[in-house]
Amino acid sequence: MGIGVAGKGREGSLDRQRFFIVGCQRSGTTLMRLLLGTHRDVHCFDEATAYAILAGVGPEEVPAETLRVGYKIPRWTNALLDAEVTDFGHPIRATDVYRGEAIVFMLRGLLDTVASMIKLRGRSQQTWLHTWGLPTVEHWIGHDKRFADTYAREIALFRAAAHPDLAAAALYWRHKTDAYFHYQHLGLPVIGVRYEALVSRPESVLRGVVGHLGLDWDPAVMAHERSDHPQISKAGLATGGTDPTRAIDIRSVDQWREFIEPSAVDEMLAIADGLVERVAAL
């Protein structure tokens, strides 16, 4: 199917105005922001403004006709239910962010997600994995006892790995992706969207997402590349180097073969510990 849906949550219901777009970084959250942002009744904030707005330190300007306001916040994916929400290397902290809103949770295969972490490079030409992924994992291990206890086996595998960078990336993906199944178990109003299904069967998947938000279908979401989008850089790109003029396609599916040594795959899958199959089954 490509999507998975849970209940209405501990507080509030699906008729709430706000919703959140979350998921492991490099899993397609920006694409989902662009797609839903073209819906006539939706306004979406990207990361450049979403975190500040939710922390109460940034201005929030929403068109009067908007029925749903989306916040793309992948940094906070695994921390939505925390009393204080923050992320390593990010200056913004917020309290009591989640109040029962609908959640759109992007899910992408382990290997392609990690490949995208390697593919994306910043101004220094360092990969996203080395700029953010590895330091974040080390921070979790050293400063988050809950993480260290929960993933003790996986941390040991990472420390012993022949390909430690890729093993760390797998652990990063594991922690972020585990949050979907945790939220689902709690009965929160979360819909899981597999990136691979979204790009291969966009209309059927997007109809499920739009319905989850309690909105009528708008065919405009199928042609986001023809729309003007807010929060686009001077270079014409959205967060993470996403080109808003690129139509939905499957070019990034199975890209991992260009970036990941086959000898590293078994180590990565051992850390994922069956989660790859659970995601693929959605």
Language-model segments: which ranges?
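PAPS-dependent sulfotransferase catalytic domain
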Residues: 81-82, 87-221, 231-244, 250
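PAPS-dependent sulfotransferase catalytic core
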Residues: 1-78, 123-135, 232-247, 251
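Residue-level detector of family-conserved "landmark" positions at structurally sensitive sites
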Residues: 46-47, 220-222
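C-terminal/domain-terminus segments
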Residues: 50-55, 198, 273-282
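C-terminal accessory extensions appended to soluble enzyme cores
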Residues: 249-282
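Short, flexible helix/strand-to-coil boundary loops that buttress conserved ligand/catalytic motifs
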Residues: 46, 117-118, 260
